[in-house]
Swiss-Prot record:
Disulfide-linked positions: none
Organism: Geobacillus thermodenitrificans (strain NG80-2)
Role description: Long-chain alkyl alcohol dehydrogenase that can oxidize a broad range of alkyl alcohols from ethanol to 1-triacontanol (C2 to C30) as well as 1,3-propanediol and acetaldehyde. The best substrate is ethanol. Also oxidizes glycerol.
Lineage: Bacteria, Bacillati, Bacillota, Bacilli, Bacillales
EC numbers, comma separated: 1.1.1.192, 1.1.1.6
Pfam families named among the record's database cross-references: ADH_Fe_C, Fe-ADH
InterPro entries, per database record: ADH_Fe/GldA, ADH_Fe_C, ADH_Fe_CS, Alcohol_dehydrogenase_Fe
Keywords: NAD, Oxidoreductase
Temperature characteristics of this protein: Optimum temperature is 60 degrees Celsius.
Protein known as: Long-chain-alcohol dehydrogenase 1
Any one GO molecular-function label of the UniProt entry: long-chain-alcohol dehydrogenase activity
Length: 395
């Protein structure tokens, strides 16, 4: 593209101990009555206390809202927005994975708007956001979604997903502290980590890629490739957690500015129809989508192979692109995620409905370097079911 639109959140604190910046930022924003939106499990294990205790010690009024579930349905979004509207809050803090952060963004913005959440959905909504809403601070506790730096809130519908998206959803402050991720269990570490990798990979091959997003994406891939396996094997590995937090943050910035594409388009129906975690949906499809589009972006796939730790010095560009797909397959397997749709209990009979839903994700599909039509999408799902990489001429 000739002119790139580059957007970053106003302010981020990134690094071990970054949570120490929370109280100063709350003071700077002039808040008094704070709504914290978080996962109930994070309250149970005491992690949310690390956020709320310093605030209460400073005399702030803090209400903790925990009606948060993974892959939140539209109804959950409506409830969070209604709660934010009814309260007299002047700041929203999101603490958790992508679901909690997405709900926090949604509640903060729609708290000052009329109508339902459904009115503002990307695919079917009829209204547009007109006001910034309440200030928001986003604090991720996983290294994967990148929600703390994007302007999107994802909601599950009956069989697929839709989004509310506008720059008003951007955080006023993002606080990325790797020490908050140390307690994340291996499977979640793996799923969110591959989610971050997918963000970087898809941003790098996106038709909207720019030199800025390219630099962010490659740096993210390097960090994730060297540290995700370590973080899965040993959650207390401080350097691995630091690398993953930074990698996820950079990947989030990359895909926010370049966009994600086919992997996410095909992953959304897996979550909508079978309630598979978003990161795992991306992970199982990543090698198959990238293998299918490989011929349309061989140079970039070769670059990704090198960023993953490969060495293409003695390989042709085409050979390196093949090796990239193989490495992505190996990476997903190494962190323990099933390599086929059947591994998640998805029957072959579901491929038709998955295809019909994925075709509707035009916003995502438009960014693919290879236009993916209905037949292409069906071929990729069939490949992911069979566990065999296919390309268009072989499909």
């Amino acid at each position: 593209m000739s002119v790139a639109r580059i957007v970053f959140p106003p302010l981020s604190h990134v690094g071990w101990g970054a949570l120490d910046q929370l109280v100063p930022e709350v003071k700077r924003l002039g808040a008094k009555h704070i709504l914290v939106i978080t996962d109930p499990m994070l309250v149970k294990i005491g992690l949310v206390d690390q956020v709320t205790s310093p605030l209460r010690q400073e005399g702030y009024s803090v209400h903790v809202y925990t009606d948060v579930v993974p892959e939140p349905p539209l109804e959950t979004g409506e409830k969070a927005v209604a709660f934010a509207r009814d309260g007299k809050f002047d700041l929203v803090i999101g603490v958790g994975g992508g679901s909690a952060l997405d709900l926090a963004k949604l509640a903060a913005v729609l708290a000052v708007h009329d109508g339902s959440v459904a009115d503002y959905l990307n695919l079917t909504g009829t209204r547009t956001l007109e006001k910034k809403g309440l200030p928001k601070i986003l604090i991720p506790t996983t290294s994967g979604t990148g929600s703390e730096v994007t302007n999107i809130s994802v909601l599950s519908l009956e069989t697929t997903k839709d989004v509310v998206t506008h720059d008003y959803l951007l955080a006023d402050v993002a606080i990325v502290d790797p020490q908050l991720t140390v307690s994340v269990p291996p499977r979640v570490t793996a799923a969110t980590g591959i989610d971050a990798l997918t963000h970087a990979v898809e941003a790098y091959v996106s038709v909207n890629a720019s030199p800025t997003s390219d630099g962010l994406a490659v740096a993210a891939i390097r960090l994730i490739s060297r540290s995700l396996r370590k973080a899965v094997a040993n959650g207390s590995d401080k350097q691995a957690r630091i690398d993953m937090a930074n990698g996820s943050y950079l990947a989030g910035l990359a895909f926010f500015n370049a966009g994600v594409a086919g992997v996410h388009a095909l992953a959304y129906p897996l979550g909508g129809q079978f309630h598979i975690a978003h990161g795992e949906s991306n992970a199982v499809l990543l090698p198959y989508v990238m293998g299918y589009i490989r011929q349309s972006c061989t140079k970039r796939m070769a670059d990704i192979f090198n960023a993953l730790g490969g060495n293409s010095s003695f390989l042709s560009e085409v050979e390196a692109s093949y090796r990239c797909v193989e490495e992505l397959e190996r990476f997903v397997a190494d962190v323990g995620i099933p390599k086929t749709l059947g591994g998640f209990g998805i029957p072959e009979s579901a491929l038709e409905s998955l295809t019909k839903d994925a075709v509707q994700q035009k916003r995502l599909l438009a960014r693919s370097p290879l236009p993916l039509l209905e037949a292409d999408i069906r071929a990729i799902y069939e490949a992911a079911f069979a566990g065999t990489i296919v390309e268009p001429h072989k499909a």
